[in-house]
């Protein structure tokens, strides 16, 4: 069969199209393979224990994020919001190996942090680290293929593919993304992309087709992701690794885009009081056209981070020549940059006050409209604590200026004075405190020091029968075909090894009288009547209990015994380092948990929600069977063992606990620098 020209052309085009599709599929898989091969083994999953002030105390929390190894000695780049407040860091490598890491430095202004793996802790036969290299983010263009890598939701490493959709993405609302008081958008213009970003991907690399890092993923909003450009990330991470911090200059200039889009330069929106810019004579409304000889311009908000990078990147103490316009007149200003302080200092906890507090920085003192940086600023207040209970009570933002007549210029003054006041005291000490709230100068009295010892009621001398009961209400007596005038109780449970069990009382027995005296219980609110009647006897007394069993008369003589010590009278121990409390097992604990009389264990009475014990997984009600393999059934032995472990700074404390019908091992790995 001969083909006409039209058929031949059609078949040829179809063949070419099929060939191109096949070639496209092959070629499209190559970038992914290369990117994965180059970078995937360098991805780490980061498990972090962080600490920050809230509710009057330093709260610990667990979180996960991602990072990427960038050096042979184990430097890992991630986000500040992942690890910037870390007290303990564990990195899981692509092959499952777990390595502890330390924080070298963190920068909230760019949301970047650098970790260093504890390489000496790795096994001698461990594989060499795979490292990823930074590319040039200035060469990235809209439409470029990219790969977002990380460990979403704390799972294993993953890769998603997308394209670059924006090379100068900023937050639509100025100052909407803040870390430690710093506006991240002041310096960062994200690379926008549509590679899917899941929770936990933060800190992972954004990679190009050649396998180079072009960004560090930071945010995911719907289907849009944002990555910190690699050029900025590389520069900041190198300085963090070397110095542990970023040194930036400060001028007091606050600029915005020009109002007239046809005009060059930037508009001065404001000048901070007493700043280098104010001293140079720059005023709001002036136009800046050149900064240190470099032409500057901002017609839209996306242009501002470029200018801010230039300003903050100058050496501290450098003389800067600025040219521009002031009221349409050409001007040249000269200023000397000063060192930029962080927006806030790290908060500290004062347990005896129920507060977290912090020092002022230059900017935080200016924001608070203070003339200097003296005083200790209240960061958070715990409900029920000493500061919350004072009248007037302290609130966040208050500035403590003196304690007991002693001036407070900084947090360390407050700590020192407090230690002097409470030293050797066993009760809270009412202390006069001077503080400022806005423009008001106030006084209050705060009772600081150890908590008052509770006056626990003594019950151990009282007798008991060893049963639980329910009142014979009118409804019950009618259902049991008893006379309507019947009063008494029904035995719901007989506890083991008790006077009731020894005397032969059984569950289901109906009791109407004790030694001939009617048990005046016939309403739900009469639940205490039976117990109160027994309390009238002395331990060792013989009492006759009369009633019915299976519709037959029942009379049983019972020798009442001393009531076992209730839970609130048993020895307990509050472990302050790891923040949990244990006590010895009560009779009720053994009954409820079906434990034998001599079965060892200590019950956890309380676990602070932010302590190391909580992070290890201990829960209120857990039964501690062993600590590091040792059985400890007495509180004094437990206290001695815990003090020994703390003194030795044990790297690992393993609790073998019983939870319901299950047993499990819980591992506590303290960060001793943090707990001391």
Which ranges hold each PLM region?
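Bacterial N-terminal signal peptides
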Residues: 9-18
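Short, conserved beta-strand segments of beta-strand-rich sandwich/propeller modules, principally
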Residues: 319-321, 430-432, 542-544, 652-654
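C-terminal accessory/binding modules appended to enzymatic or scaffolding proteins
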Residues: 358-386, 580-615, 619-624
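Conserved catalytic motifs of ABC-family nucleotide-binding domains
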Residues: 285, 397, 508, 621
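Serine-dependent protease modules
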Residues: 22-264, 269-280, 290-319, 326-363, ...
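C-terminal soluble interaction/assembly domains
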Residues: 605-653
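Short, low-complexity, Pro/Ser/Thr/Gly-rich segments in the mature regions of secreted, periplasmic
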Residues: 664-676
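Bacterial N-terminal signal peptides that target proteins for export
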Residues: 1-9
